[in-house]
């Protein structure tokens, strides 16, 4: 479908689609973003929304749609416009449960497609009777609500459809989405539209692709982290390609952005300040056919559905700056060959094109894979490895930075409590210190990301039920992962995709998360 052309000074066009109380939240939050985008609310759902939007798209442009739950999934499977799905965060779920817990101890939680296994710990800690259900269709949701009503449930936590059905049935409905989560969806939609429209104006895109992290964000005072920071400063003296190696959650993109910032800070000090984009792509999260067009761009008519006038690829967008290739070990072999040629020739030819475009780009790549093993197995080109790894940076796992674990836990807990307007007391600091053995004993397979997420969860518990006695036993009750016996080697590396799939009873999303890879990569490995 041909959409109306975009003018260079146009703001992104975003439509919000909802049929329940989410409509009002959309309306309120959209006021905070109306200076950044043209936002139109659509109060329809499912097939009525699809029919209306398709008709509207015949004469109007839309860059992104924001929706939620089963309605959002329905739209995403039937529309060509990108649909940003709002997903409740851990904060949203626990805050809704805390609100429901003040009303009754008999609570139902009804979520789209899947239940939430992590709520088992919450149920035990606060002595609540949680009845978790999932649904696919509206009829399915109505059936789940009726069963909860028959079982004596008094309050139901869920999306707008669920809370409306619960209140129709005479129960209390607790809305699961927070304003913060909706704001994040608007931010994601803006980021996505900026990326998809970058071919129209490189300068505007460069301004939108600034780095978020600096060297000071590499937290930790251990000798290992001091060595990492010193290495980053050293690599900032060179424009050579860098390969960052480390487990999932060790901060590979953070390190890449720090190298970018430090290098161009030195560069601009000598030659004058300029715009230097930092462009990132996850090579394992995009299908091979799409990744080729994303990296190298395409000409008009290169394939069905290609944009009029073609589109610049990430190499062109990153000209004068840095291209960060995350999970480079997941890149398919045919694209590895083409990437090698671009790196050697310093020019790129768009898909369907014939004219090479010179590019001046520093490439920083990252992987959690064992590339040496992949090269031996023929999954990764050795010549490309040598081209990408002129400089190498190894990020240590958290279990090897034991001196950093307690200070990081305290820092993350402070930030998380502050976000909830809750104080960090001396008693909490003492409780963390008393729980140091528990924290140090855990293997931290998710590294920094896992520690931060745990402290966010702990903060939410503490904001609901403040306790002056944060004991190791209480920590293990709230964070059951800490009670498990740590293995010397991270568990994900011990399982094949098939074994992980069996471990999680066929749940592909859970298996991919456990292995620390995307669903696309999981499928690719499962088939190989």
From Swiss-Prot:
GO terms for molecular function: ATP binding; ATP hydrolysis activity; cis-regulatory region sequence-specific DNA binding; DNA-binding transcription activator activity; DNA-binding transcription factor activity; phosphorelay response regulator activity. GO terms for biological process: negative regulation of DNA-templated transcription; positive regulation of DNA-templated transcription; propionate catabolic process, 2-methylcitrate cycle; response to radiation. The keyword Signal does not apply. ATP binds at residues 318-327. Residues 218-461 form the Sigma-54 factor interaction domain. Keywords: ATP-binding, DNA-binding, Nucleotide-binding, Transcription, Transcription regulation, Two-component regulatory system. It comes from the Bacteria. Residues 508-527 bind DNA. Gene3D superfamilies: 1.10.8.60, 1.20.5.170, 3.40.50.2300, Homeodomain-like (1.10.10.60), P-loop containing nucleotide triphosphate hydrolases (3.40.50.300). GO terms for cellular component: cytoplasm; protein-DNA complex. The keyword Flavoprotein does not apply. InterPro entries: AAA+_ATPase, Homeodomain-like_sf, HTH_Fis, P-loop_NTPase, Sig_transdc_resp-reg_PrpR, Sig_transdc_resp-reg_PrpR_N, Sigma_54_int, Sigma_54_int_dom_ATP-bd_2. Involved in the transcriptional regulation of the propionate catabolism operon. This is Propionate catabolism operon regulatory protein.
């Amino acid at each position: 479908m041909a959409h109306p052309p975009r003018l260079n000074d146009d703001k992104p066009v975003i439509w919000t689609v909802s049929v329940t109380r989410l409509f009002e939240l959309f309306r309120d939050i959209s006021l905070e973003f109306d200076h950044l985008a043209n936002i139109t609310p659509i109060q329809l759902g499912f097939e009525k929304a699809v029919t209306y939007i398709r008709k509207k798209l015949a004469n109007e442009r839309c860059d992104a749609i924001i929706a939620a739950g089963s309605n959002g999934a329905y739209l995403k499977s039937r529309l060509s416009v990108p649909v940003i799905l709002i997903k409740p965060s851990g904060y949203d779920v626990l805050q809704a449960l805390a609100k429901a817990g003040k009303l009754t101890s008999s609570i139902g939680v009804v979520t789209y497609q899947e239940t939430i296994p992590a709520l088992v710990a919450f149920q035990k800690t606060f002595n609540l009777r949680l009845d978790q259900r999932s649904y696919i269709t509206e009829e399915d949701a109505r059936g789940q609500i009726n069963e909860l009503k028959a079982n004596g449930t008094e309050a139901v936590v869920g999306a707008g459809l669920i809370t409306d059905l619960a209140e129709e049935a005479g129960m209390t409905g607790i809305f699961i989405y927070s304003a913060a989560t909706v704001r994040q969806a608007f931010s994601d939609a803006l980021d996505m539209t900026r990326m998809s429209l970058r071919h129209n104006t490189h300068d505007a895109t460069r301004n939108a692709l600034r780095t978020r992290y600096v060297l000071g964000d590499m937290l930790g005072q251990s000798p290992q982290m001091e060595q990492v920071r010193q290495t980053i400063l050293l690599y900032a003296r060179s424009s050579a390609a860098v390969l960052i190696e480390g487990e999932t959650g060790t901060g590979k993109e953070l390190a890449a952005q720090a190298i970018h910032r430090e290098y161009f800070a030195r560069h601009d000090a000598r030659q004058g300040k300029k715009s230097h984009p930092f462009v990132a792509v996850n090579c394992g999260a995009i299908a091979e056919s799409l990744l080729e067009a994303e990296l190298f761009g395409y000409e008009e008519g290169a394939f069905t559905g290609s944009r009029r006038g073609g589109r610049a690829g990430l190499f062109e967008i990153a000209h004068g700056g840095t291209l960060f290739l995350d999970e480079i070990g997941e890149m398919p072999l045919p694209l590895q060959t083409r990437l090698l040629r671009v790196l050697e020739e310093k020019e790129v030819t768009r898909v369907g094109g014939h004219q090479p475009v010179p590019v001046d780009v520093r490439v920083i790549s990252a992987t959690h894979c064992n590339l040496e093993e992949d090269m031996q197995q023929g999954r990764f080109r050795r010549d490309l490895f040598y081209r990408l790894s002129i400089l190498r940076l190894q990020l240590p796992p958290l279990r090897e930075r034991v001196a950093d674990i307690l200070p990081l836990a305290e820092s993350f807990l402070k930030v998380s409590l502050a976000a909830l307007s809750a104080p960090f007391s001396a008693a909490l600091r003492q409780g963390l210190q008393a729980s140091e053995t528990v924290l140090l004993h855990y293997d931290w397979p998710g590294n920094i990301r896992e520690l931060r997420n745990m402290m966010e969860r702990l903060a939410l518990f503490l904001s609901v039920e403040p306790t002056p006695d944060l004991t190791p036993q209480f920590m293990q009750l709230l964070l059951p992962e800490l009670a498990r016996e740590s293995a010397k080697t991270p568990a994900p590396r011990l399982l094949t995709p098939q074994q992980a799939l069996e471990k999680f009873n066929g749940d592909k999303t859970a298996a991919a998360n456990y292995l620390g890879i995307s669903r696309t990569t999981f499928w690719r490995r499962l088939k190989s």
